[in-house]
Structures are given as C-alpha cells and as structure tokens.
C-alpha cells in the first residue's frame, strides 16, 4: 500500500491509502474539492472512507464525495451516522479494505466516540495523537484520553502515526517550555523548524521516535516527573497527563 496526503483547510491532512491498482481509501475528508482534484490527477478509484470522529473538518466532504462515488463504503463511529457514515464501527472491530485488514479501537477523549484505524504500519489516529501533542478534550475526560494514548503507545515501534493536523512545531515549542534541556526534543525542534520553513510536512512520524518527543507519552519519565514536582506532587501518570493537558490548553 502507498500512503498519500492531501492538504486541506489551514492545517488539516486528508490521508489517502492506495494499492497498486489505484484503488484507495480516504481518511477524514473534511472537504471534497481537494480530494476530487487528487482523484482526477492520479486516476484513483475510491473504495472506502474512514471517519475517526464527527467534527466538521473531518467529515465535511463526505456527502459530496458520495455523490461522485456512490459505491463507496463509509466507515465511522456512531457519532458520524448523520455525517454520511454507511457502516458503523467501534472498538475491536476489524474490516477488510483494499485487501488489507484494519483493526478499530476506541480512543475517547477529543470526542466520546473517536476511533482509530490500524493496519500495520499505518495508524490513522485523527485528533487523538499529534506529533508532540494530543487532541483537546472537547468531550472526554483526561482519564479517557490518557487511556486512549496508552493504547496507541502499545503499538509496534515502527507504527506510522498519521495524524490529521500539522501541529508539530507548536507542540514541540510547548514540550521545550516544560523540558528546555531535553537534547532529543531540541534536535527534533530544529528538524521540524527546517521542514516548516520549506513548507514541508512533518508527518507521518514513527512511534518509536514519538515516544521520545511527546510529553503526553512520557508521563512515567523521571525527567518529566521531576519537572512537574517543582510545581506539584502528582503520584499517578493520569494526573500528570491532566496537568500537562491543562498547561497546553493555556500555552
């Protein structure tokens, strides 16, 4: 399978996974126009759409795309039923698309019904995990989001994190505000800054590296714990996650 990305809105990525025959699955098409343009340019044959959650910038193009390609199957959690989903999916489900098996797992936090799609090495995680960060808690609790991130963190080292937004630079700036002397984060910041100056994307990222630069995946890391302890003593990783998320919300 081949991974492709289509920029949308100000900072969204619509991911498109294709096979050698040109059949494709489209992930979180927030708008239809750039997808239709890419389909025409590459002569792709859309087979399915994956929806991770119900927010407009992830589902806004679904109904128009279905008008052009009514044969497509649209997979999504229950919260996307009125957004164009034709087949509802949830935690533990498996589906077969493009001849490959995708495993679904629930990742509540950003929204209550958020799901991720995984077919090694590709993880389509919507707004749950970003490079260097995680989604805002619009509907879920810190505990839910922490558990969702731990599900992702348990995946193989070579998992490719296909997030839906280009937030990496801002997220790394936040990480450095907490751990300013972390050598790996500083090195990553320089690389990301160079990419963004050239208007190049920073995604996808490998989970093995993400574990080093994403503080939300490092809540049991001694350096981070020591830094948090300067302000407050928090015994549980979930509490440290909630502290970080609160700090990021006002950063």
UniProtKB/Swiss-Prot annotation:
Keyword Nucleus recorded: no
Protein name stated in the entry: Hydroxyacylglutathione hydrolase
Lineage: Bacteria, Pseudomonadati, Pseudomonadota, Gammaproteobacteria, Enterobacterales
GO biological process annotation, one example: methylglyoxal catabolic process to D-lactate via S-lactoyl-glutathione
Record has NAD as a keyword: no
Subunit organization: Monomer.
Function summary: Thiolesterase that catalyzes the hydrolysis of S-D-lactoyl-glutathione to form glutathione and D-lactic acid.
Entry keywords, A to Z: Hydrolase, Metal-binding, Zinc
Cofactor: binding comment: Binds 2 Zn(2+) ions per subunit.
Catalytic activity: an S-(2-hydroxyacyl)glutathione + H2O = a 2-hydroxy carboxylate + glutathione + H(+)
EC numbers, comma separated: 3.1.2.6
Annotated metabolic or biological route of this protein: Secondary metabolite metabolism; methylglyoxal degradation; (R)-lactate from methylglyoxal: step 2/2
Domain of life (superkingdom): Bacteria
Single annotated GO MF: metal ion binding
Pfam families associated with the record: HAGH_C, Lactamase_B
UniProt-listed SMART domains: Lactamase_B
InterPro entries linked to this entry: Clx_II_MBL, Glyoxalase_II_hydrolase, HAGH_C, Hydroxyacylglutathione_Hdrlase, Metallo-B-lactamas, RibonucZ/Hydroxyglut_hydro
Cofactors demanded by this protein: Zn(2+)
Residue positions binding Zn(2+) 1: 53, 55, 110, 127
